[in-house]
């Protein structure tokens, strides 16, 4: 697997996304060949505002959704292809020629590329432009696991303030609950 910076910090992409916001080891133990299953599961998940196992996380998603409606953060004209150009056009030739990957069923992400052990998708709104990078990495004990990274370019000072304001909520409530949800769902996939 390429290093995140090597993959995305090429040419003008490095200028577009200059901040690694989050990196998480996912509780998704598996074999070398399980990455396609992780990508399928990740792209087919329900909206987190309705599907999170944590009531606090669902409440935060509901508040964010309401604020987005009030302030117009999530209007289509604020997204990829409108306010910001897609990063797919700025990827190096080998990634641009790769499959973009599957569409997301219930999330506003636009796939960028899919490789044997990497998947990247972008999202934009009035507060930021971000790339979600999902990788499949050795776990140190002979198996593999998922790794999630989020690279962000805030949209001006308001976007930077927004990202700073939500950081504690993401780290203390949203991501810990999401990791528990991911672990439960992954174990459920193994049971099938």
Please provide the spans of the model-predicted regions.
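Short hydrophobic helices that act as membrane-entry/anchoring signals
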Residues: 57-68, 159, 163, 167, ...
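A conserved amphipathic terminal alpha-helix motif
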Residues: 162-192
